[in-house]
Regions:
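Flexible loop/hinge segments at secondary-structure junctions
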Residues: 1-182
Length: 182
């Protein structure tokens, strides 16, 4: 927490920052004895070596689909509602906030999308476009999970799917719920 939570953190002097997975990987490879963080998918696809990270309970955990899934499931119990502030969630799951973080990779996060709760505030938005967006979100949370493992991502835990369903049902257009089929 010394540096806060942000997509871009102001690190102390003497540190290097790369742009995205390719930039970070290149800097680490060019600078002996350096470490960096890239997505597991990127590391696997590019044969980049990676190591274990110490968890809040002192356990050293290797990043695998199983340890990422364990972290996601444990963290899902402390997620705020979809229409509440997510500022406290941070960039990575905070396994310090969960009862049993054992077996969870400690620097894991969800990929996410931010959507207005009331879609008619978006210029040019129509009921048809709102419905298409909400149907896409529903697909991503359900049928789209089929593709996760093949891309070295973890399918959403059941608790997160349920959480996302409730959030998607909150989306409205002109005050009317869009996801009327769910």
């Amino acid at each position: 927490n010394n540096f806060g939570a942000s997509k871009v953190i102001s690190w102390p002097g003497g540190t290097l920052g790369g742009s995205g997975n390719p930039g970070v990987a290149a800097l680490v490879q060019q600078n002996q004895y350096s470490i960096g963080y890239v997505e597991l998918t990127y590391a696997l696809q590019n044969n980049i070596p990676y190591g274990k990270v110490q968890s809040p309970v002192g356990e050293f955990v290797e990043p695998t689909l199983e340890t990422l899934a364990t972290a996601a499931a444990a963290s899902s119990l402390s997620l705020p509602q979809g229409d509440q502030s997510w500022a406290s969630v941070g960039t990575y799951f905070n396994l310090h906030k969960v009862a049993d973080p054992r077996g969870g990779y400690p620097i894991t996060s969800f990929s996410h999308i931010i959507v207005y709760k009331e879609l008619n505030v978006i210029p040019g938005m129509t009921k048809e476009k709102a419905t298409a967006l909400v149907k896409f979100l529903w697909y991503a949370v359900h049928e789209g999970q089929f593709y996760a493992s093949g891309l070295s991502y973890v399918p959403l835990p059941k608790e997160v799917v349920t959480h996302n369903e409730a959030t998607i049902r909150m989306i409205t257009f002109n005050g009317q719920q869009v996801a009327t089929w769910s």
